[in-house]
């Protein structure tokens, strides 16, 4: 059997200034929204002796109309799964799962020099890009067999590999040119696992499960990247015993110790 799934998305967004809500609540309702002052793009702004008061309540309409913040993103998620039963040994099957998650996006921010948040710095501009992709590979073999209608074995062993990558590039600048900031940030890591499991049941009543995992990640130091995790569990299906089968008040009863 082969299953394939894929989903993509492209989005374009424009973001308003969230501070406009608080500014609308605090703004003096007796003042006009527009007063023709060309210094602020025709919008009203508080002044003292002809100078802009940066700590005064901002004009909420100007905050919404004069800020430009747009973001564009592309996302793609997909996986393919192959499940194969061997003809020469029908109790044995192989399962392979390949997956990916990719995303890229850009964001632009611009405050003109006439805007309430850009006036002091002669305007502001910013740019950010984000690239992210994750890859996944899972593979395991599973063997299940019944013997004499009393013994059931289910044995599985596999390998898992994951890759995580993210990079961000960011730049902001006041248009007077005296305070530019930028940075590039990248992260990359891997997660690798080897795992196995053995299930045994006798007469579908008495159960034993043993598992073993060996996980390693590049996020830890070289001396501490790997961890071994064993576990054992015992089970007893009490409902399958003769003294419980005729007890209709109990639909299922199982004791498990691990």
Regions found by a protein language model. Give the residues of each.
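Extracytoplasmic loops and strand-loop junctions of Gram-negative outer membrane beta-barrel proteins
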Residues: 58-67, 119-126, 177-183, 214-216, ...
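One face of beta-strands
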Residues: 4-6, 230-234
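Secondary-structure transition/capping motifs at alpha-helix termini
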Residues: 88, 146-150, 202-204, 235-250
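Outer-membrane beta-barrel translocator domains and adjoining extracellular loop/strand segments
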Residues: 16-21, 107-114, 167-174, 221-226
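Acidic/histidine-rich catalytic neighborhood
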Residues: 252-258
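Signature of Gram-negative outer-membrane beta-barrel scaffolds
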Residues: 170, 175-231, 250
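Outer-membrane beta-barrel transmembrane strands
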Residues: 4, 13-15, 55-109, 127-147, ...
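Flexible loop and strand-edge segments within Gram-negative outer membrane beta-barrel domains
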Residues: 1-56, 67-75, 116, 121-132, ...
């Amino acid at each position: 059997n082969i299953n394939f799934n894929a989903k993509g998305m492209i989005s374009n967004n424009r973001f308003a200034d969230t501070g406009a809500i608080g500014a609308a609540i605090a703004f003096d309702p007796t003042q006009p929204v527009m007063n023709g002052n060309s210094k602020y793009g025709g919008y009203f702004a508080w002044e003292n002796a002809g100078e802009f008061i940066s700590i005064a309540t901002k004009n909420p309409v100007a905050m919404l109309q004069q800020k430009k913040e747009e973001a564009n993103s592309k996302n793609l998620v997909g996986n393919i799964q192959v499940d194969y039963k061997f003809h020469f040994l029908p109790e044995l099957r192989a399962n392979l799962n390949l997956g990916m998650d990719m995303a890229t996006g850009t964001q632009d921010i611009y405050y003109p020099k006439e805007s309430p948040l850009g006036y002091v710095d002669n305007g502001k501009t910013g740019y950010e890009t984000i690239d992210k992709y994750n890859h996944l590979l899972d593979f395991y073999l599973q063997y299940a067999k019944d013997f004499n209608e009393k013994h059931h074995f289910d044995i599985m062993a596999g390998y898992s590999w994951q890759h995580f990558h993210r990079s961000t590039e960011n730049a902001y600048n006041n248009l007077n040119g005296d305070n530019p900031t930028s940075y590039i940030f990248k992260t990359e890591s891997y997660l690798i696992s080897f795992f196995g499991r053995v299930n045994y049941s006798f007469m579908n009543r008495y159960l034993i499960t043993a598992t073993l995992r060996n996980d390693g990640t590049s996020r830890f130091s070289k001396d501490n990247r790997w961890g071994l995790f064993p576990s054992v569990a015992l089970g007893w299906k009490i409902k399958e015993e003769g003294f419980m089968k005729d007890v209709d008040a109990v639909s299922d009863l199982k004791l498990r110790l691990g």
